[in-house]
Swiss-Prot record:
InterPro entries documented for this protein: ExoRNase_PH_dom1, ExoRNase_PH_dom2, ExoRNase_PH_dom2_sf, KH_dom, KH_dom_type_1, KH_dom_type_1_sf, NA-bd_OB-fold, PNPase
Cofactor(s) this protein requires: Mg(2+)
Superkingdom, taxonomy of origin: Bacteria
Subcellular locations according to the entry: Cytoplasm
Keyword set includes 4Fe-4S: no
Protein name in UniProt: Polyribonucleotide nucleotidyltransferase
Pfam families: KH_1 (PF00013), PNPase (PF03726), RNase_PH (PF01138), RNase_PH_C (PF03725), S1 (PF00575)
Natural source organism: Yersinia enterocolitica
CDD domains: KH-I_PNPase, RNase_PH_PNPase_1, RNase_PH_PNPase_2, S1_PNPase
Record has Transferase as a keyword: yes
Cellular component, GO annotation: cytosol
Matches recorded under SMART domains: KH, S1
EC number: 2.7.7.8
Subunit structure: Component of the RNA degradosome, which is a multiprotein complex involved in RNA processing and mRNA degradation.
């Protein structure tokens, strides 16, 4: 008999249910979490033993959406789900980031978390539900895990914070922020904002953390009722004697190595020191474990760098805590791209391009929450050469997708609306060098490339990565962190924004005890750094260029009566296809009658506009048009009068005298003036040649000629 154990509670405006004991009983733990008809089934499986020689923590998080959750069948050829979408990859990372720091440092057993969306309410995004499910399943499993965590989405509507806003509410919100953390500490923040102040962003983080306590309380209650016994796992005791011997041999030498400012030279020296120390110790005692020595060397290395920062000494590259590396900013570096920039900050460099396209180039995204079109794309590429390595080159990895989305969030708030700038815009950031904060370099480069392309962004934006070193009550916030400072520090804190406020904030915190005061210091220090970078960027380009590139398509907009759309499209698209072939343009028609014409040549666009005006022009009775004979029949001739319209000249209307044979007067392709004498209810046009040639007839309308 299956007996579910259920916790149900109110979470803001939503009801959350966590259920365990019914499904996947062979998994280490499994829960079904639902929030107002959005349900995610989350399982956790942990291996009891680590693999021999395992040197890192093999945690895998897979978030997957099933189309049956929305009552749909996949549209792919095989009619089943395939590789993870970009949205699924981002949500997998969102779950991974706050749970990874909560496993013990020396825990190396393989753990897999799988979150499957099995029901979806279009108003409730499954990501928060999946985060709650991962927290609950890990807490129930007995695996060494210092949770649970809570998770909340925070909106900002009418100057008020909103807990877990619906999809419709988010459209009105100036903020979309996800925060996750334990009862006492924030661990992860992911957000995009419409240029909010530092205080407003910090307030949102604190609000979300306070509100999610109800989640943690209910997970703890569920664990008390249904949790599995804690694993009998203990960290291996530290070999203090060996640690002391390693520190004696390596600490001073590593300290000297970490005064080398050039990254590759420093890495070479550090690797040589580690190899020397390992070789020396093994020569003294061949029973020692080389892997253990390497682990201790890593710990000594971390202590050397951190203690120097906490003592107020210069950082690895000689900077003070709030100094920014040297900047080099250039625009228009690629001759044929629509916009380009090369942004260099120390040993981090991004080559960024902006490309303008038409509405047809927009990305159609079929998500579980519904279909949408995205006309602003930002892609981030991180080739192995950027860090002096070799490696696989191919489709983007999780990290590249995540960094690209963060950079996009940093720029999105300043992009013009489609009515202001009716282009699809694609930005690509090629990381050509990397030593910390390449995603924020991408934000800076994107802003520069967009302005170089003539995109009327509302303001320039820049990004900066902050770090933290904390021991007890002593802490130091670092501006513009290097890769080593990110790896050896306690926090990775990325902020993007304009002079007026923040557009994106991402935090990943590895320790507990990060207070509001520390976050306030970091945000204020980041603001100073951001303004400094913007000042340098503005020396290269301060406003968007007045015109787009000569190589970019120019989009001209016109409006027609929606009832005339069918005339422009024609039967089976025949008219619009002929128009695009004739004029060499791209033509897009919207349901409200808005027509967008894209062309690299202004004359071609004008020709297309003129032809559309002809097609949609109202036929005026008693008006004379320049026509062309298209068909000859026994009872008269059909004459095209422009705009794809055709009328009949009856045999009696060809001449003032009797006409026995139409071909005596007219030939195919002959141009003749005709007068419109009637348009009947069915839109059929009656024409007359004889009335058009009377002495008092007006001249034919030249604009109607083919």
């Amino acid at each position: 008999m299956l007996t579910p154990i259920i916790r149900k509670f109110q979470y803001g405006q939503h009801t959350v249910t966590i259920e365990t004991g019914m499904m996947a009983r062979q998994a280490t733990a499994a829960v079904m979490v639902s929030m107002d008809d959005t349900a995610v089934f989350v399982t956790v499986v942990g291996q009891k033993k680590a693999k021999p020689g395992q040197s890192f923590f093999p945690l895998t998080v897979n978030y997957q959406e099933r189309t049956y959750a929305a009552g749909r069948i996949p549209g792919s050829f095989f009619r089943r789900e395939g590789r993870p979408s970009e949205g699924e990859t981002l949500t997998s990372r969102l779950i991974d980031r706050p749970i990874r720091p909560l496993f013990p440092d020396s825990f190396l057993n393989e753990v897999q978390v799988i979150a499957t969306v099995v029901s979806v309410n279009p108003q409730i995004n499954p990501d928060i539900v999946a985060l709650i499910g991962a927290s609950a399943a890990l807490s129930l499993s007995g695996i060494p895990f210092n949770g649970p965590i809570g998770a909340a989405r925070v909106g900002f509507i009418n100057d008020q914070y909103v807990l877990n806003p619906t999809t419709d509410e988010l459209k009105e919100s100036r903020l979309d922020l996800v925060v996750a953390g334990t009862a006492g500490a924030v661990l992860m923040v992911e957000s995009e904002a419409d240029i909010l102040s530092e205080d407003q962003m910090l307030g949102a983080v604190v609000f979300g953390h306070e509100q999610q306590q109800v989640v943690i309380e209910n997970i703890n209650a569920l664990v008390a009722e249904a949790g599995k016994p804690k694993w009998d796992w203990h960290a291996e005791p530290v070999n203090e004697a060996l640690h002391a011997r390693v520190a004696e041999l390596a600490a001073a030498r590593l300290g000297d190595a970490y005064r080398i400012t050039e990254k590759q030279e420093r890495y070479t020296q550090v690797d040589a020191i580690k190899a020397d120390v390992t070789e020396a110790l093994l020569a003294q005692d061949d029973t020692l474990d080389a892997a253990e020595i390497q682990d201790i060397l890593g710990s000594v290395e971390k202590d050397v760098v951190r203690s120097r920062v906490l003592r107020g000494e210069p950082r690895i590259d000689g900077r003070e805590k709030d100094m920014i590396r040297g900047l080099d900013v250039r625009t228009g570096v690629l001759p044929r791209t629509h916009g380009s920039a090369l942004f260099t900050r120390g040993e981090t460099q991004a080559l960024v391009t902006a490309t303008l396209g038409t509405a047809r180039d927009a990305q159609n995204i079929d998500e579980l929450m519904g279909e949408r079109t995205d006309s602003f794309l930002l892609h981030y590429n991180f080739p192995p050469y950027s860090v002096g390595e070799t490696g696989m080159v191919g489709s983007p990895k999780r990290r590249e997708i995540g960094h690209g989305r963060l950079a996009k969030r940093g720029v999105l708030a300043v992009m013009p609306s489609p009515s202001e700038f009716p282009y699809t815009v694609r930005v690509v950031s090629e990381i050509t060098e990397s030593n910390g904060s390449s995603s924020m370099a991408s934000v800076c480069g994107a802003s520069l490339a967009l302005m170089d392309a003539g995109v009327p962004i509302k303001a320039a934006v820049a990004g900066i990565a902050m770090g933290l070193v904390k021991e007890d009550e002593n802490f130091v916030v670092l501006s513009d962190i290097l890769g080593d400072e990110d790896h050896l520090g306690d926090m990775d804190f990325k902020v993007a924004g304009s002079r007026d406020g923040i557009t994106a904030l991402q935090m990943d915190i590895k320790i507990e005890g990060i207070t509001r005061e520390i976050m306030q210091v970091a945000l204020n220090q980041a603001k100073g750094a951001r303004l400094h970078i913007l000042g340098v960027m503005e020396q290269a380009i301060s406003t968007p260029r007045g015109d787009i590139s000569e190589f970019a398509p120019r989009i001209y907009t016109m409006k027609i009566n929606p009832e005339k759309i069918k005339d422009v499209i024609g039967k089976g698209g025949s008219v619009i296809r002929a128009l695009t072939d004739e004029t060499g343009t791209t033509i897009d028609i919207e349901a409200d009658g808005t027509i967008k014409i894209a062309a690299t040549d202004g004359d071609k666009a004008k020709h297309a506009i003129r032809r559309i005006e002809e097609i949609t022009a109202e036929i005026e009775v008693n008006r004379i048009y320049a026509g062309k004979v298209t068909r000859i029949v026994d009872f008269g001739a059909f004459v095209a009068i422009g705009g794809g319209k055709e009328g009949l000249v009856h045999i009696s209307q060809i001449a003032d005298k009797r006409v026995d044979k139409v071909t005596d007067y007219l030939q195919m392709g002959q141009e003749v003036p005709v007068k419109v004498i009637e348009v009947d209810r069915q839109g059929r046009i009656r024409l007359s040649m004889k009335e058009a040639t009377t002495p008092d007839a007006e001249a034919p309308a030249p604009e109607a000629a083919e």
